[in-house]
């Protein structure tokens, strides 16, 4: 919204320009000024847009002024005369005489008709009615006398101009091409009017509010001081402008907090939370000493399905430990892991890996089975049953290699009864029970299963499935005292495809008791069933198929080495005597000696342990 004073000045300027149009030839500029109220601001600034001018002027101030003004108003200055030129500006007398003669006769201005102004929209500043627009008058054909007069005037002008025929020929060519010829005085007057009109338009434009021209402000403010905290990236080569960004707050790394706290968060102190308070008597109370508050790490246990305040306390709780010790809760996870394939190399057995019972490591290691009493609670680190199985496997192999080692075993009171007592069995007490020479011919593989002196526990085997027997399931031997998978009675649906340890005693398969957690990892190149099997190293040899009963017969069959024949039984029942090619007290060597063909899957029963009657 422009001020009223400025609007009146513009109206007076437009009316004066309309009056001057009657006295001077029109260049089409008045028409552009009349359209300024309708067209865009770009048309107001460049009224000569699309027009070209040829200046037939001597060097001087007029030439310099018109050159700059025409270019500023959108016109183009041509250096050579051609048919495409719109106007010729000349300072010759004949041009002035022609323009003055036409203006006195009331002839139309030499400006082209397509740019003629319409003054109907211009209002008189005194409030009078708008003037009717002037219609172009058709040019009346001149008589012969007038044409001769004009020709004489032209010739006189050419003579007075120094006798140069170049100027007369230039104007003659311009007239023949239809190019408009203007005098320099008229052009100067119209250019000044347009300059004043452009200034009036700029004053009428309202100022834009602050913040609408960020680009202009950024061009004006080239230098500024960055306020901390900020980040600025500069180019070393100075070819590109730097990038910078100012932050309201910037993170700081603090190493003063506890270990489990985030280094990007400042430690909270009690002193910062409490302010000095004045007591009722007016005396200020002493400020408490500031110390760092430990951050409690809260979380949610998906196993127990409850939230906890501290992870360490929750892992030691009875509820979480009882969940972690249940093997069947991890059965589905074990089944999925068993389906995965890996490219791990089979690490040979090393004597330095297992921890001996007399070593300092085993005395202080709570996971070592030799140092734990059966009634003693396990360590919180044994949260996963797989950890206990691996450690138990190493412990059982170590016991088989070292005579005189003691271990805890659980006994069975009857075939199906729960463990009734715990008996400490020494390997040295079992070896003398073997017949003479069998100690050199074979090796004793300790069984982590439960057995007592009154009940013969002969073998712990792995069946190709798991079922829930409601009663004892007798096994009937097939030909040559061997059992095939078809001879094994299956009762109920198969819960898991992998094998599970079962106890064979007196030709009956019974459900095992807590020793079922005695498992270890077997490489996939030796058994395709699953990765958790019994810790007996004999399974690492291949697919061993054996049967031990209370009777005097004992047949052992190795499918991959069937040509070797049956292993001869010893005179003592329920014992094994290995042939000469397997005669080695170190069962770890048996794990490494894999003959060709032992990795081939065989449809036989997978047995895990060899046991000896403790009586």
From Swiss-Prot:
<dbReference type="GO" id="GO:0030295">
    <property type="term" value="F:protein kinase activator activity"/>
</dbReference>
<dbReference type="Pfam" id="PF07535">
    <property type="entry name" value="zf-DBF"/>
</dbReference>
<dbReference type="GO" id="GO:0005737">
    <property type="term" value="C:cytoplasm"/>
</dbReference>
<keyword id="KW-0597">Phosphoprotein</keyword>
<dbReference type="InterPro" id="IPR038545">
    <property type="entry name" value="Znf_DBF_sf"/>
</dbReference>
<feature type="binding site">
    <location>
        <position position="304"/>
    </location>
    <ligand>
        <name>Zn(2+)</name>
    </ligand>
</feature>
<feature type="region of interest" description="Disordered">
    <location>
        <begin position="93"/>
        <end position="141"/>
    </location>
</feature>
<keyword id="KW-0131">Cell cycle</keyword>
<feature type="binding site">
    <location>
        <position position="301"/>
    </location>
    <ligand>
        <name>Zn(2+)</name>
    </ligand>
</feature>
<dbReference type="InterPro" id="IPR051590">
    <property type="entry name" value="Replication_Regulatory_Kinase"/>
</dbReference>
<protein>
    <recommendedName>
        <fullName>Protein DBF4 homolog B</fullName>
    </recommendedName>
</protein>
<dbReference type="GO" id="GO:0003676">
    <property type="term" value="F:nucleic acid binding"/>
</dbReference>
<keyword id="KW-0479">Metal-binding</keyword>
<dbReference type="InterPro" id="IPR006572">
    <property type="entry name" value="Znf_DBF"/>
</dbReference>
<dbReference type="GO" id="GO:1901987">
    <property type="term" value="P:regulation of cell cycle phase transition"/>
</dbReference>
<dbReference type="GO" id="GO:0043231">
    <property type="term" value="C:intracellular membrane-bounded organelle"/>
</dbReference>
<dbReference type="GO" id="GO:0010971">
    <property type="term" value="P:positive regulation of G2/M transition of mitotic cell cycle"/>
</dbReference>
<feature type="compositionally biased region" description="Basic and acidic residues">
    <location>
        <begin position="275"/>
        <end position="284"/>
    </location>
</feature>
<feature type="binding site">
    <location>
        <position position="314"/>
    </location>
    <ligand>
        <name>Zn(2+)</name>
    </ligand>
</feature>
<dbReference type="GO" id="GO:0008270">
    <property type="term" value="F:zinc ion binding"/>
</dbReference>
<feature type="binding site">
    <location>
        <position position="320"/>
    </location>
    <ligand>
        <name>Zn(2+)</name>
    </ligand>
</feature>
<feature type="region of interest" description="Disordered">
    <location>
        <begin position="264"/>
        <end position="293"/>
    </location>
</feature>
<comment type="function">
    <text>Regulatory subunit for CDC7 which activates its kinase activity thereby playing a central role in DNA replication and cell proliferation. Required for progression of S and M phases. The complex CDC7-DBF4B selectively phosphorylates MCM2 subunit at 'Ser-40' and then is involved in regulating the initiation of DNA replication during cell cycle.</text>
</comment>
<dbReference type="GO" id="GO:0043539">
    <property type="term" value="F:protein serine/threonine kinase activator activity"/>
</dbReference>
<keyword id="KW-0863">Zinc-finger</keyword>
<dbReference type="GO" id="GO:0031431">
    <property type="term" value="C:Dbf4-dependent protein kinase complex"/>
</dbReference>
<dbReference type="GO" id="GO:0005654">
    <property type="term" value="C:nucleoplasm"/>
</dbReference>
<keyword id="KW-0862">Zinc</keyword>
<dbReference type="GO" id="GO:0008284">
    <property type="term" value="P:positive regulation of cell population proliferation"/>
</dbReference>
<keyword id="KW-0539">Nucleus</keyword>
<dbReference type="GO" id="GO:0010571">
    <property type="term" value="P:positive regulation of nuclear cell cycle DNA replication"/>
</dbReference>
<feature type="zinc finger region" description="DBF4-type">
    <location>
        <begin position="294"/>
        <end position="343"/>
    </location>
</feature>
<feature type="region of interest" description="Disordered">
    <location>
        <begin position="371"/>
        <end position="407"/>
    </location>
</feature>
<dbReference type="GO" id="GO:0019901">
    <property type="term" value="F:protein kinase binding"/>
</dbReference>
<feature type="domain" description="BRCT">
    <location>
        <begin position="43"/>
        <end position="133"/>
    </location>
</feature>
<comment type="subunit">
    <text>Forms a complex with CDC7. Note that CDC7 forms distinct complex either with DBF4/DBF4A or DBF4B. Such complexes are stable upon replication stress.</text>
</comment>
<dbReference type="GO" id="GO:0005634">
    <property type="term" value="C:nucleus"/>
</dbReference>
